[in-house]
Amino acid sequence: MADLWPSATPAGAVRFARGTRDLQTCRDFYGGLLRLPLLFEFDADNEDGIAGVIFGVPDASLTLEFIQAEMTHDGDPHDQLVLYLPDAESLDIVARRLIEAGVRTRTQYAYWEQRGARTFSDPDGRALVLAPWIFGVDDVPTPTGAGD
C-alpha cells in the first residue's frame, strides 16, 4: 500500500482531528479501553486555548487527535472510525473488553455485519467499527448471510 501514495503529494504523515465533549472520557476510551498508544497530550495553556490528545493509529505516520470542543451536533451514521484488526480472535478480545466496560454496541451497515465486523459507540456517540481483517493487506471477507 505504501507505494500507492501519489508522488505529487509527498506527505510524510496524516492526522485526523475530531472534537470531543469530554476529553478525559475520550482519552480513557481510546487510550485505556482500545489501548491505542498515546503519543502526545496538551492542555489549554497554548496559543489556541485548546486541550487535546494525539494517539498513534497504529504508528506515528497516521495519528488520531481529539480536542476538547463544544459539539454542535451528534454526528451522523457515516461518521465512523474503522479499526482493522488482524483476525477474528483479536476482534473478540477488543470487543469483549469494550462490552465488559459497558460500551454499547450499535446497529451497523450490512456491509460490516456481513463481513464479521462489530460496531460500537464511542463516548461522543460516533461509530467505532472493529473489522477482522487488515484493509489493503488481507482480502476483504466474502459477505455472509447475503441472500441466504
Model-derived features: where do they sit?
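Vicinal oxygen chelate
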Residues: 1-9, 12-22, 53-58, 72-148, ...
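A short beta-turn/loop motif at secondary-structure boundaries
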Residues: 44-47, 72-73, 110-113
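Conserved beta-strand in the GNAT
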Residues: 64-67, 129-131
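A short, sequence-level motif marking secondary-structure junctions
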Residues: 68-73, 134-136
